[in-house]
């Protein structure tokens, strides 16, 4: 068959040249027998109509429950990290995702890299609704949302934390927020 005759056949709508077949799904004999048996036995339809739709879910619920990884009621983990470069920061984010508290000691890093690291981890902590505190000079605590971070300082009468039940608490000596490297100057444009 030539190319022109094939084009004419396609444009004219000759279906025998189409390689696609209509595949109709006809019920098998077993399926037909099941349908006929169900129609003949009205007890099945009444039982289905009178049944509670929530019973099915309650019966199978215990088999579908899956525990969250990294959560344990007995203890909590704290990861102490002393990174030397920014390349080690994804490990801290992974620890936060595993619901571990991370203490970063950034004294070994270049100040610019340390600021970048704090910003990166602070963003990850914010994304998981966690908490962050500055513990000391270049030392920061980042905790997931399941951990209460309580700070006690003489200036504050009440702890600065979000309380939830059955979560471990870590106390810090002082509540100060991290300052960016460019915020070290005491000058203000509005003074």
UniProtKB/Swiss-Prot annotation:
Q: Where is this region: Disordered?
A: 150-191
Which portions of the chain have biased composition (kind: Low complexity)?
Answer: 150-164
- InterPro entries to which the protein is assigned, alphabetical: Cell_div_SepF, Cell_div_SepF/SepF-rel, SepF-like_sf
UniProt entry tagged with the keyword Cytoplasm = yes
Q: What is its main location?
A: cytoplasm
Keyword set, alphabetical order: Cell cycle, Cell division, Cytoplasm, Septation
Q: Tell me where in or outside the cell this protein is found.
A: Cytoplasm
Report biased composition (Polar residues) as residue ranges.
165-178
Q: Does the keyword Cell division apply?
A: yes
Q: How does it assemble?
A: Homodimer. Interacts with FtsZ.
Q: Which family does it belong to?
A: Belongs to the SepF family.
What does this gene product do? Cell division protein that is part of the divisome complex and is recruited early to the Z-ring. Probably stimulates Z-ring formation, perhaps through the cross-linking of FtsZ protofilaments. Its function overlaps with FtsA.
Protein name per the record: Cell division protein SepF
Q: Which organism is it from?
A: Prochlorococcus marinus (strain AS9601)
């Amino acid at each position: 068959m030539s190319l022109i005759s094939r084009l004419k056949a396609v444009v004219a709508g000759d279906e025998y040249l189409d390689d696609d077949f209509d595949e109709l799904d006809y019920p098998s004999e077993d399926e037909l027998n099941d349908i006929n048996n169900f129609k003949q036995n009205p007890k099945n339809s009444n039982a289905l109509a009178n049944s509670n739709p929530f019973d099915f879910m309650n019966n199978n619920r215990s088999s579908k429950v899956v525990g969250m990884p990294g959560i344990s009621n007995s203890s909590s983990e704290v990861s102490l990290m002393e990174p030397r470069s920014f390349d080690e920061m994804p490990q801290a984010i992974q620890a936060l995702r595993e619901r571990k508290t991370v203490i970063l000691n950034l004294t070994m890093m270049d100040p610019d890299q340390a600021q970048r690291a704090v910003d990166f981890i602070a963003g990850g902590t914010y994304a998981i609704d966690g908490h962050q505190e500055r513990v000391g000079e270049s030392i920061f605590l980042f905790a997931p949302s399941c951990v209460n971070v309580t700070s006690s300082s003489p200036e504050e009468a009440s702890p600065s934390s979000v309380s939830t039940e059955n979560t471990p608490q870590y106390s810090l000596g002082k509540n100060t927020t991290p300052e960016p490297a460019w915020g070290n100057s005491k000058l203000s444009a509005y003074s």
